[in-house]
């Protein structure tokens, strides 16, 4: 009888016993070590710095922000024109017979926001955004809505009037002017919302290949003499319950990560001495109505800073801000900014600023090093150039 050949075993009984006893120990060690750390997500941009993108694996939705820059309003008439176009833009997005039904069919969640220097359209989707859909959206957005423009202007005038009747809003709003320019709403709408003017930021669980073809323009409508409107804001006479004083200055253009770092650090260095002075003031006289608000408004050309003071006996603001600028203040401001950068919240809002200023996509990664390199003397010079410039001005509204 032939003997059957035995197949060689991969592991002996002793080795199997060792593996069985040792495997739980290995699993325990791996669990204690925790998951492998993931590198920070890198922001990328196309060659024209029009589309900024960041892959966030743990994010379940795709988020697309569309940014349309425009100059800040210099007077009430220009503000009225911008508000009119913004209201028409919102109607175009929301009315079912305009873009409302089309957006619903895409399954997109839509939010709009109007800022001093740009309009922002935020889209959320559980499916990737495609070139053709985004291109179609931008081209349709350039088409004005079918609306009674005279009635819309009257409604916008009334809304502007109600806002400017508020003392604080009136003081921080653009001033009134004796000039009342005319407007062709169809042509102006199409000009302000050209596809080629939009910038994009995009985050999602996987990269998308959006291309510059989405910015191809649509034909602009011909001007119509029958639709010429006169931009005449309604006069207001606001009354304040407490002394109000506005301090406003321009913010410089941002061309690099260093400019961006100075802009952000400068804001923190304005907030610190104001908060410190106000805290002492309220401790000494808690019954006094005293406070402040600071608006740091980003625009394509730099921005505007508006400081509104409430109450009396405030010190001279330029002197206060410059005298309180010490090395420890710079370090505190730097750490506050680094804490903001490390947080996950507001990640895409940082990218929106990169797109608005068209900065290199690695600017946020370089920001900690740029902040560390900014010394006291550089920030003194930067802040002094803002507070002592010809563009610095003050307005007051007595109670």
Segments predicted by a language model, with ranges:
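His/Glu-based metal-binding/catalytic segments typifying zinc-dependent metallopeptidases
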Residues: 44-88, 217-280
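Extracytoplasmic/periplasmic C-terminal soluble domains
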Residues: 158-253
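A generic N-terminal leader/anchor concept
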Residues: 1-108
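M16 family metallopeptidases and their MPP-like homologs
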Residues: 60-82, 98-142, 155-180, 197-202, ...
């Amino acid at each position: 009888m032939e003997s059957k050949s035995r197949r060689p075993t991969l592991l002996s009984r002793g080795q199997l016993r060792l593996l069985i006893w040792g495997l739980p120990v290995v699993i325990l060690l791996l669990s204690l070590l925790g998951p492998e750390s993931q590198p920070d997500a890198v922001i990328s941009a196309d060659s024209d710095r029009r589309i900024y993108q960041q892959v966030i694996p743990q994010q379940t939705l795709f988020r697309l922000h569309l940014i349309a820059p425009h100059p800040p309003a210099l007077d009430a008439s220009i503000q009225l024109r911008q508000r009119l176009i913004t209201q028409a833009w919102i109607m175009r997005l929301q009315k079912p017979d305009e873009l409302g039904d089309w957006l619903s069919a895409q399954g997109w969640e839509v939010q709009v926001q109007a800022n001093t220097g740009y309009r922002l359209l935020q889209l959320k989707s559980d499916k990737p955004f495609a070139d053709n859909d985004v291109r179609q959206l931008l081209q349709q957005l350039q088409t004005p809505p079918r609306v009674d423009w005279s009635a819309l202007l009257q409604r916008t005038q009334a809304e502007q009037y109600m806002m400017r009747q508020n003392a604080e809003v009136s003081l921080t709003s653009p001033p009134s002017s004796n000039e009342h320019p005319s407007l062709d709403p169809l042509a102006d709408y199409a000009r302000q919302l050209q596809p080629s003017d939009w910038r994009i930021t995009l985050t999602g669980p996987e990269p998308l290949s959006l291309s510059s073809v989405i910015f191809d323009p649509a034909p602009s409508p011909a001007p119509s003499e029958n639709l010429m409107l006169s931009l005449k804001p309604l006069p207001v006479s606001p009354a304040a319950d407490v002394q109000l004083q506005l301090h406003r200055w321009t913010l410089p253009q941002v061309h690099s990560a260093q400019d961006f770092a100075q802009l952000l650090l400068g804001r923190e260095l304005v907030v610190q001495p104001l908060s410190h002075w106000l805290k002492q003031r309220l401790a000494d006289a808690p019954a006094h109505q005293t406070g402040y608000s600071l608006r740091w408004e980003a625009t394509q050309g730099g921005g505007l800073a508006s400081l509104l003071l409430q109450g009396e006996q405030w010190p001279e603001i330029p002197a206060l801000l410059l005298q309180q600028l010490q090395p420890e203040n710079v370090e505190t401001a730097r750490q506050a900014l680094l804490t903001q950068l490390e947080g996950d919240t507001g990640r895409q809002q940082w990218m929106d600023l990169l797109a608005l200023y068209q900065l290199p996509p690695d600017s946020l990664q370089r920001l900690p090093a740029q902040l560390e390199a900014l010394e006291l003397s550089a920030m003194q010079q930067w802040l002094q150039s803002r507070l002592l410039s010809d563009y610095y001005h003050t307005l007051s509204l007595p109670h």
